[in-house]
Design a protein with these regions (language model features):
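Class I Rossmann-like S-adenosyl-L-methionine
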Residues: 2-172
Length: 172
């Protein structure tokens, strides 16, 4: 079954049966940003097509973890990006967040695998995005590995920002 549209949040021309857990996680994350659908419903709709329990678990970890730690991830990404994360296309933002979550918080996934899989996923979106962002994604994720994290904001001077970045709590 080939999917020729972008409305379903999948790369054009991908076979639903061959979607990787990362691709499905990205699809759910993008849908979560673009619709008012409940996250549990989005996961249930897409995760049921995954036959392996291990892959379903990875999808859920990637989705929930990326959303839970988004404040921290965005802070780390902004430190290695030349321009602010929010100025990039939404798909590229989510690809970077997905890759960064794996690098920063999942110690069972080798860094090289996290970078490589995210770059391959980025390439699959090149046609939809009008350009190939894989070079930027590769460079940013590799910089995340190389460049030490900047110090957290001072809790005495910036208590809300400090808590937000340390624990992934959005500032209200």
């Amino acid at each position: 079954l080939l999917v020729p549209t972008m409305s379903d949040e999948r790369p054009v021309g991908t076979d639903v049966r061959r979607l990787s857990p990362r691709s499905i996680a990205l699809s759910i994350l993008l849908s979560c940003q673009r619709t008012d659908d409940a996250l549990d419903e989005l996961i249930e709709q897409r995760a049921t097509s995954i036959p392996q329990p291990r892959d379903r678990s990875l999808v859920m970890e990637l989705v929930y973890g990326t959303l839970r730690r988004q404040e921290t991830i965005d802070w780390r990404l902004d430190a290695v990006l030349a321009k602010p994360l929010h100025k990039l296309p939404m798909v590229v933002q989510m690809l970077l967040r997905l890759g960064a979550y794996q690098l920063l918080f999942l110690d069972r996934i080798p860094a090289s695998a996290a970078v490589n899989e995210t770059v391959l996923l980025t390439k699959s979106y090149a046609k939809q995005l009008g350009r190939d962002w894989s070079g930027l994604v590769n460079g940013v994720l590799r910089n995340l590995i190389r460049v030490p994290a900047p110090p957290f904001p001072d809790p005495a001077s910036y208590p809300a920002q400090s808590l937000s970045i340390r624990y992934g709590i959005p500032i209200w």
